[in-house]
Amino acid sequence: MATTPRLASLLLLLALCAAAAGALRLPPDASFPGAQAERLIRALNLLPGRPRRGLGAGAEDVAPGQLLERRVTLPGLPEGVGDLGHHAGYYRLPNTHDARMFYFFFESRGKKEDPVVIWLTGGPGCSSELAVFYENGPFTIANNMSLVWNKFGWDKISNIIFVDPATGTGFSYSSDDRDTRHDEAGVSNDLYDFLQVFFKKHPEFVKNDFFITGESYAGHYIPAFASRVHQGNKKNEGTHINLKGFAIGNGLTDPAIQYKAYTDYALDMNLIQKADYDRINKFIPPCEFAIKLCGTDGKASCMAAYMVCNSIFNSIMKLVGTKNYYDVRKECEGKLCYDFSNLEKFFGDKAVRQAIGVGDIEFVSCSTSVYQAMLTDWMRNLEVGIPALLEDGINVLIYAGEYDLICNWLGNSRWVHSMEWSGQKDFAKTAESSFLVDDAQAGVLKSHGALSFLKVHNAGHMVPMDQPKAALEMLRRFTQGKLKESVPEEEPATTFYAAI
């Protein structure tokens, strides 16, 4: 039987993998995505819940293509705070068998005219509620399960939506496995459909500036989602969404460039020695070859690329040991790098579940099933859609905490500089400037035209958690078109904020 060129390439790839694996003496589970998914999630103390089947008792149903939303005052808030303009709801996805997307919507503490911002947490398969309560939401959870106001919450300056975008993540669920998404096309179409219904529900916000934000695997979600919104606007498909820009924090966007940067970053940060660097770099050529086969198809070759290229990261982690790969300044305590267990406890409270309308639907912080379903999407290059957005004037901010290993600033900076667009040469020639917050350097900024890159000091993977004030200032200046300004205009005090 004749061998097709693609099959021959895959066979060659497997041979290269075997040779490189022998040279590296990798651990037995180094190339198996299931084992890695479980290890990554356990390291974050985010154990996946059981698969959800059907509508949970007490959860409100909603017709396909419709949105069911309620105003929310969460238990644990101080008494007498009044109506905060907080909402929670489900969107019943059309063109699915039984999928429902969960979201929070927090109106701005400032003005109704503030921009509408949507936040997407990555994973893939991790809930945006992690950001609500640990990063940039209105409040954090105290150990006694009370809620403490976050004075740097992004709702201070925006009307912000937090969505669990993939079925099986957070409180989003379906009774039918066929609703599981495997690529960005499915996720971005779901999000676009959600926005169409959301703005019909909230027409008072439809003319506001709109920005897409997120971190980690949202480096895949966001470019595809932004392109979907932009194309929908161009084709007059429905309600015009006033997309002005998007921001990706410590994202995975161009794997071919970012995986190659792992060893350089690890060596620069003294995580590995030069001999380790030379040895692990033997995996880079087969990784590059595998990604080339993958292209932008998201097929079986992309799974092979995932297995090959993650051997680079796994080999580094074998040497790094107990260090936190989301923040290399820190050690993981045992198997746990961060403890988000208060979130599980909070959502286990019956009063909380009744308040947000989820009934007994099980909350899943991070889902291994969603992670595995997206594996063929992992090594795809999502940078390819960004130049067209830049050319049409959509503002793009790529930011990265300097101490993150897994989606490090070096790899992000390299793909940003390598991106081909009309301003590429001028961007490369632009001098870096200090990003100042309270007259102190909070980061280093490079900006030209619609493109900006910000390296954030003293932060790891989750910049809004590590540097909340700098993150809020970043959002303020980005959404106001003043990112290059060192000192923002004084924010007028509001009676509302003073009251809380």
From Swiss-Prot:
**Which segments are removed on maturation as propeptide?**
22-73, 485-500
Q: Which UniProt keywords apply?
A: Carboxypeptidase, Disulfide bond, Glycoprotein, Hydrolase, Protease, Signal, Zymogen
Q: Name one GO biological process term.
A: proteolysis
- E.C. number(s) listed in UniProt: 3.4.16.5
PROSITE patterns, sorted? CARBOXYPEPT_SER_HIS, CARBOXYPEPT_SER_SER
Q: List the disulfide bonds.
A: C126-C366, C294-C309, C332-C337
Name assigned to this protein: Serine carboxypeptidase 3
